[in-house]
Structure formats: structure tokens, C-alpha cells
Amino acid sequence: MSHLQNLLLDTLLGTKHVDSAALIKLQEKTLCVTSPGFSVMPSDVRTLLNGFAKNPLLTRREGLYFKEKDYKCVRADDYSLYAKNENTGVVVVKTNMYLVVATYTAGMYPSVCVEATEKLGEYLRKKGN
């Protein structure tokens, strides 16, 4: 298992409030690592990248279509996207080299998912990633 995959498992899934997670390489626009059983299609990668490329107001208004579900965007800025669909959600944090993607499901606390994902993003930014 790679260092990055261990980082995802320990810092995100270890909280028990992140269902699945992935790192997407910004430059290559490809998946780098994922948690076991989590597949992110190329169309989903494009959706997340476009969420940051658009004006944040437009992203908030339009929402996100991720993993075959429509999500209402509750936060969109230069570094973070938060979106929800009923009792599930996706949190995306942008660093210099990666998008950190985390999902949560029913029974999990979205606030814990957000905090863990933002902290991992901050750690990667400090490391120059």
C-alpha cells in the first residue's frame, strides 16, 4: 500500500465519518489513489475539476452531478466544494497537486468529514502537494 493510500485510510476513513475517499492528480486529471471499493469514473473527475474551474457562484447554483446523483452544492470557493444529496454528501478540497475527495453516508457526521478532509488538504498544501 502506498504512503498516499495509507494517508487516506488513516486520516479520512479512520474517523468513521468518511465512507470513501480518493486523491485526483490535478495536472494529469487522473485518479491517484482511492479507498478500497471506491471507483471514480473519468466523467466524475471532470465534474469535480469543472466545479473548481467555474465561477463558485455558478457551481453553487448548478450543483454537482457525481457518481450518478445530483448534489446540491452548499459551499464552493477556490479551495473547497461541499455538496449533499439527502443524507449523503461529497467534500472536495483542492491542493497544489491534488483534489482530495471524501464522501459520507447516512449516520455519519458531515462536519467530521469536512474537518478531516480540510485538515488533510491543509497538510498536503504545507508539504507542497
Curated annotation (Swiss-Prot):
Disruption phenotype: Homozygous knockout males are infertile, whereas females have normal fertility. Sperm from knockout mice display severe impairment in manchette formation, amorphous sperm head shape and flagellar defects, resulting in reduced sperm motility. Sperm of homozygous knockout males displays a significantly reduced acrosome reaction and decreased viability. GO terms for biological process: acrosome assembly; flagellated sperm motility; manchette assembly; sperm flagellum assembly; spermatogenesis. It comes from the Eukaryota. Expressed in testis, in germ cells in seminiferous tubules (at protein level). One of its GO terms (cellular component) is cytoplasm. It holds the Pfam family Profilin. It is found in: Cytoplasm. The keyword Cytoplasm applies. InterPro entries: PFN (IPR048278), PFN_euk (IPR005455), PFN_sf (IPR036140). GO terms for molecular function: actin binding; lipid binding. Keywords: Cytoplasm, Developmental protein, Differentiation, Lipid-binding, Spermatogenesis. The keyword Cytoplasm applies. CDD domains: PROF. PANTHER family: PROFILIN (PTHR11604), PROFILIN-4 (PTHR11604:SF2). Belongs to the profilin family. Involved in male fertility. Required for manchette development and acrosome biogenesis during spermiogenesis. Binds in vitro to phospholipids, including phosphatidylinositol 3-phosphate (PtdIns(3)P), phosphatidylinositol 4,5-bisphosphate (PtdIns(4,5)P2), phosphatidylinositol 4-phosphate (PtdIns(4)P) and phosphatidic acid (PA). Contrary to other profilin family members, does not bind to actin in vitro. This is Profilin-4. It comes from Mus musculus (Mouse).
